[in-house]
Amino acid sequence: MKSLWLDRESPFTSDALPDEKHYDTIVVGAGITGMVTALLLSRSGQRVVVFEARTVGAVSTGNTTGKLSLLQGGVLSALRSQYSLKVVKAYVEANKSGQAWLMQYLEQQGVPFQRRTAVTFATSDDGGQRLRKEAAVSRDAGLDVHFSRDAGLPFRVVEALELEGQAQIHPMEVLDTLARDIRAHGGIIVEGVHVQNVGSEHPMEVSTSTGAFTADTVVLATGSPILDRGLYFTKLEPHRSYAAALRPRVGSDVPQSMYLSIDSPTRSQRTHPTAEGDLLLVGGYGHTAGRAASPKHHLDELLGWAKQHYPGAEVTHTWSAQDYQATNLMPFFGKLPRGHGRILFGTGYNKWGMSNGVAVALSITSDILGGQSDWATTIHHRVTSPQGALQAIRLNAGTAKRMIEDRAKVRSNPEITEDTHPAEGTGVVGLYKGEPAAVSTVEGKVCMVSASCSHLGGLLSWNDAEKSWDCPLHGSRFTPEGKYLEGPATHHLQIPGRGKD
């Protein structure tokens, strides 16, 4: 599976690992937050290096649906159920700031994007009630939303809420431009460097897979913070969702707005212009990472829905993305606990990273260079509601229960031996010499790795859509060979009989 955005000849080539070992700021992660932060700091005259464990945009940003919208499904009414209107308005102002900065930047740089009307639609009476709540909160928060009964979709819609003047982007073209701009201001971007730890002394020692560096400031711009200070992995629920690009049947009429359902399962829709005509992009059908019996089934349901309503459309790409939802629904950002004010981070964008991610980059940069926006101050000083605290308790109780159940279950599975060869495209978990092991077969290659996540030891589950090992506790993911892909883990999986790889 490869996203429409990543399926291309990339114009980006990684910088060589620098000889210089000290920087003003080391940015960890080359997605939208990390790259905007690196650009703003480089422009200020700082010496900045970006370390990316995989490739630029390889994780969330390169797998997004690319919507830059202030109309975000049921997000605002959910926030209002936990916070004052002042806090909800601050969230909206943050997203306005992120959206405005990115749209202005793309216009200045000549990067194409399309302005579109964003539409949240309901297909049930219950969904209609939720939509009316969202409309009321949206208006209270200053958004000029309005209702429509003709959403232009090829299926029945009870009601639709619209917000004009939003945008859709090609996320990798955005990152390409940011990368060129960072380098033009003296910044360095190095792929294939996995940051594993950050010290607490000043200057801070940054331990990586390629050696140690030091920095006055470190920015963690990863999906989930890779440091356990603050225990944010206990406050975040990892979600995987699915997307596909389809070429519509010749002559068919495809709606041009950006759509999102308020009913479950979530269904998202937009177009993408190409030389051969518009592609239709659909998404949704998500689940908690690592906990679906068959992730492929979720993807198949999405494709079935798209083909039902757009008959004759040809699938060109399918992919998946991982996002993190905070238990209190508000993104976490700012100074990491026990980081002496020198480690900053952002996480919990809950599928709205194009606006939230840029907003967090603006706030982090202000923290480093001096100053802060009113919206950031309001969000930082919010009080977690009883509802948010209860959700955190539920999340962690469920995680502990899952770990206990999985450890008991693995002992009843068939034993793993050197002769265990799963069917093509499948993976199995069992005991190998008394320890949990995971064996998979992908493209004829059989691989055995530890079935214990390198983060906190969760028992991994096989992802039959992406052919990966996923942790059901906090969302870390690994290749069949045990190489780290994403999540709070900082090391590859152990190989039975060899220890850490």
Describe each region flagged by the PLM.
Residues 1-25, 43, 483, 490-497:
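Extreme N-terminal leader/targeting segments of oxidoreductases
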Residues 2-8, 74-79, 103-177:
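Flavin (FAD/FMN) cofactor-binding and adjacent substrate-gating region
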Residues 23-50:
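N-terminal Rossmann-like FAD-binding beta1-loop-alpha1 element of flavoenzymes
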Residues 43-63:
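Glycine-rich FAD pyrophosphate-binding loop
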Residues 129, 136-137, 161-216:
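Helical element adjacent to the flavin cofactor pocket in flavoenzyme catalytic cores
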Residues 165, 263-264, 292-301, 308-395, ...:
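C-terminal catalytic lobe of FAD-dependent flavoproteins
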Residues 198-271:
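Flavin-dependent oxidoreductases
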Residues 244, 424, 428-501:
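Rieske [2Fe-2S] iron-sulfur-binding domain
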